Regions:
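Enriched for short, Lys/Arg-rich terminal
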Residues: 70, 74-97
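Basic/aromatic recognition patch in beta-strand/loop cores that engages polyanionic ligands
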Residues: 49-78
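Short proline/glycine- and basic residue-enriched helix-capping loop/turn segments at helix->loop/beta transitions
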Residues: 43-46
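Short alpha-helical segments used as structural interaction elements across diverse proteins
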Residues: 2, 26, 31, 59-60, ...
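Arg/Lys-rich, positively charged N-terminal/basic patches that mediate binding to nucleic acids
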Residues: 1-32
Length: 97
């Protein structure tokens, strides 16, 4: 079984999304969102090639679309390192950088 780790930026992304969900939809939906993301991270850790190449953002990076979010990560010998989590609405702005 692979393992996943989050960078500080990815951890901050997840916290921001959780807090938005908490304030907008309540604790139950926010917690369900967080658990769903954790399951996705575990899936990626076990199957690092599930995502597709994201070399256009960073050499060696991979991306995986999950629900309305894009998870960027790097393959590691023992799993994956989640580098950022971005809502799909933010993707056009990210491409402009």
């Amino acid at each position: 079984m692979g393992r996943y780790r989050l960078t500080k930026d990815a951890d901050a992304d997840l916290l921001t999304m959780f807090l938005y969900g908490f304030e907008t939809f309540g604790v139950a939906r926010a917690d369900a969102f967080r658990m769903d993301m954790v399951r996705c991270f575990e899936l990626l850790a076990d199957n690092p090639r599930l995502g597709r190449s994201a070399d256009e953002f960073a050499p060696g990076a991979r991306r995986h679309e999950h629900a309305r979010h894009v998870i960027f990560y790097d393959e590691q010998p023992d799993g994956v390192l989640i580098t950022s989590i971005i809502h799909e609405r933010s993707m056009p702005r990210l491409r402009e950088r």
